[in-house]
Amino acid sequence: FEITNSTFGVVEGISGVGKTTLLNLIAGLKKPMSGEIILNNKILSNDYEFVLPENRNIGYVFQDFALFPHINVKKNILFASKNKNSDFYLKVIKKLNLESHLQKMPHELSGGLMQRVAICRALLMEPSLLILDEPFSNLDYENSINVQSILKEYISENKIPCLIVSHNTNLFNEFSELMRIELR
């Protein structure tokens, strides 16, 4: 399949069918047994050494958030940020309602807050591809709608593709540039 800029690709399928494995292959966390993975005309699947997603300029929000447990929220967010003092940084933190949580440690956060921190970190990387594995699973309805709005705006403004695994695919019905990928 091919996903173009400013498009949301929603990967659907029953549990255990390989949705997360597909994301890990694209992100470079697993090596494909066959085929090619191409991002911005570069064949990523030819990289035989393990390459972290951020080194491929891929923003990846994992199911389990992958926050660093021994540093605070602000340092977690800034870990891969390209513009640590920019207006963009402040705008994203404010939109995700994280201002009052910057000095907290990850273990002090709810699942929904950890999810928003992980999404914030991925956006501040300014990636050429955004991969989100169950980005709404720990969010209440209001925060899900807020994050959805932020993602739509970010993807549209930055003209990058976004690949999402989500069991709540109804959230994407109003997206204008939507591609559904069903794994069986």
What is the predicted function of each stretch?
Residues M105-L109, L113-Q115:
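Conserved ABC ATPase signature
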Residues G35-N46:
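Conserved ABC transporter NBD signature motif
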Residues I119:
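Hydrophobic anchor residue at the start of the ABC signature
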Residues L130-E134:
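Catalytic Walker B motif of ABC-type/P-loop ATPase nucleotide-binding domains
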Residues L124-S128:
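A short, proline-enriched helix->beta-strand linker immediately N-terminal to the Walker B motif
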